[in-house]
């Protein structure tokens, strides 16, 4: 599962081995990607600095911290990848091994980002559907433990995919296909988990017998999931089609890969913008620090009770007493 290598090696005026016209990467997209990635890295760096050093750690902040770390990792990979595309376009040599390592490294933050987003959505769904059970049985450091497991699993899948595709791809092709199948199946499972938990949460909040007032945290999560479905999911779908249907990266599919990468970079860059927009919406104070804005974006306080906290504290206290 390494479309980066193949798409970097295409030519514009020749025919490939299958007789299809090859194509060079679109130079406009190759220049857009580094611009978007630099902006996204700036935003995610601010989020990492605030959550890592300036704010008190909570369950949701641990998830958001790791999500920003995954987004930064993903943006770094594709920033370097875009520079290699530009170098390749102008005939500057780039070592094949660096392309192989970079192509497989990019799958690690993609898996971890989707996993963390699925974990956030699932936890919020459980807290809304079964609030008392959730507050009573949730381990104190569960978010940190889940994030560690996600990173370990993501690195394991990425390393195995790189090892079998780079070193044993020709001699042990069946093992490479098995690893790709596991990665693809895991991505499908994560997407179904994200979609199912988000849909259940949406139905419960908007259509339940007891409607829960919207909190800023729910708006933040909903917008993040929506942006992922629009911008982040196409890359996963492309990898799915690449594995199951054997789509080759000659004309015109090499352009599809570039577009999906650009959209995924937009997705990773948009998350900090979502946090700061939600946190600054209807803020009464004129002078707002980034720390306060980010803190408000992750608050579970409903909009109408934001300044009183009367309707939020009571259910939480009751559930904790029942534990």
From Swiss-Prot:
Belongs to the G-protein coupled receptor 1 family. Mas subfamily. The lineage of its organism: Eukaryota, Metazoa, Chordata, Craniata, Vertebrata. Keywords: Cell membrane, G-protein coupled receptor, Glycoprotein, Membrane, Receptor, Transducer, Transmembrane, Transmembrane helix. It is found in: Cell membrane. Its main location: membrane. One of its GO terms (biological process) is hematopoietic progenitor cell differentiation. Orphan receptor activated by neuropeptides terminating in Arg-Phe or Arg-Phe-amide. Mediates its action by association with G proteins that activate a phosphatidylinositol-calcium second messenger system. Its effect is mediated by G(q) and G(11) proteins. May regulate the function of nociceptive neurons by modulation of pain perception. Residues 1-30, 81-100, 165-180, 248-258 are extracellular. This is Mas-related G-protein coupled receptor member X1. InterPro entries: GPCR_Rhodpsn (IPR000276), GPCR_Rhodpsn_7TM (IPR017452), MRGPCRFAMILY (IPR026234). It is a multi-pass membrane protein. Uniquely localized in a subset of small dorsal root and trigeminal sensory neurons. Associated preferentially with IB4 class of small-diameter somatosensory afferents (also known as nociceptors). GO terms for molecular function: G protein-coupled receptor activity. Glycans are attached at residue 16. GO terms for cellular component: plasma membrane. The chain crosses the membrane at residues 31-51, 60-80, 101-121, 144-164, 181-201, 227-247, 259-279. Residues 52-59, 122-143, 202-226, 280-323 are cytoplasmic.
